[in-house]
């Protein structure tokens, strides 16, 4: 019975954190369409979707291994956390020489101008790095028992994204850069807060790295990379084709319409997160 109570409790906590943040984002759509043109919305969303595909490639989906091995009592928590951050750092450095591939994602604007995401490579790479780092920290605090902090962090990131969106888009008029920079800054602030509140610096140790554990975590995480990529490609491919064959204005309309159905998929993901946490905890105790 305690297992079911824990599962329901975790599901409720994740639901509060996830749905509150997603609803706030949907409510902000009117603001985005008011301060950004359809072309700017289309390009900005292409950047977001491209980053979502690069994220599992650069991080090697190590965040999933962090929570999987971090929940096991026999594992040393500092080893798991350190390996998670080192994997992100190594993946990021290895990916840097491949930035010219961003030129393959090109688009046309409604005014007839053409461009590619290579023009935004610095913005994209910074976004990937902050997103991967934040994910490792977020998954690790779940593993060490900060479940409520994990949910609150989701709300905090969304709130900061909205505040920074208003500042960067309405006040500074940074347009595409402001839209993406607000997400980057919110992820960075989230990482700093998690480090301070959960004292994550205590778990980062470069001495005596457990390479056997590193290998085990990679063997667990690597098969998850194709699955993560394909999930994002389903939504990205349609938008990329529209931006290339039509224009970014058309892809922006498609992107806005696509956000509402994604809420349905969130219901399943919330339960899966809670179920994974409860099951691993149960097996560990046994």
What is each stretch, according to the model?
Residues 63-66, 139-143, 147, 167-172, ...:
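C-terminal transmembrane helix end/exit motif
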Residues 53, 57, 93, 97, ...:
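Alpha-helical transmembrane segments of multi-pass membrane proteins
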Residues 6-63, 92, 96-99, 127, ...:
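Signature of the first transmembrane helix
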Residues 19, 82-112, 268:
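Alpha-helical transmembrane segments of multi-pass membrane transport and lipid-handling proteins
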Residues 1-7, 116, 176-180, 192-235, ...:
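Interhelical loop/hinge segments that connect adjacent transmembrane helices in multipass membrane
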Residues 58-74, 143, 261-286:
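Helix-loop junctions and terminal segments of transmembrane helices
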Residues 8-20, 74, 78-82, 126, ...:
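Alpha-helical transmembrane segments of multi-pass membrane transporters/permeases
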Residues 118, 122, 152-200, 220:
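Hydrophobic alpha-helical transmembrane segments
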């Amino acid at each position: 019975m305690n297992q079911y109570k824990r599962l329901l409790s975790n599901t409720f906590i994740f639901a509060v954190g996830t749905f509150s943040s997603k609803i706030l984002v949907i409510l902000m759509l009117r603001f985005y369409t008011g301060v950004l043109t359809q072309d700017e919305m289309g390009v900005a969303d292409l950047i977001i979707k491209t980053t979502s595909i690069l994220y599992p490639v650069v991080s090697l989906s190590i965040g999933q291994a962090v929570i999987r091995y971090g929940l096991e009592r026999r594992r040393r928590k500092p080893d798991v956390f350190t390996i998670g951050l080192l994997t992100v750092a190594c993946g990021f450095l290895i990916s840097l020489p491949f930035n010219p591939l961003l030129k393959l994602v090109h688009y046309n604007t409604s005014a007839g101008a053409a461009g590619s995401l290579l023009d935004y490579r610095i913005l994209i790479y910074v976004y990937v790095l902050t997103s991967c780092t934040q994910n490792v920290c977020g998954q690790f605090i779940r593993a060490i028992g900060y479940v409520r902090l994990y949910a609150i962090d989701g709300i905090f990131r969304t709130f900061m994204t909205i505040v920074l969106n208003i500042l960067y888009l309405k006040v500074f008029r940074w347009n595409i850069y402001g839209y993406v920079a607000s997400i980057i800054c919110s992820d960075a602030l989230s990482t700093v807060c998690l480090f301070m509140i959960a004292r994550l610096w205590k778990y980062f140790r470069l001495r005596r790295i457990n390479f056997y554990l590193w290998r085990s975590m990679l063997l667990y995480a690597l098969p998850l990379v194709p699955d993560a990529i394909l999930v994002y490609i389903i939504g990205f491919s349609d938008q990329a084709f529209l931006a290339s064959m039509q224009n970014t204005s058309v892809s922006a309309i498609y992107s806005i319409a696509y956000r509402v159905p994604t809420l349905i998929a969130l219901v399943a993901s919330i339960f899966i997160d809670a179920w994974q946490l409860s099951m691993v905890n149960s097996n560990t105790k046994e």
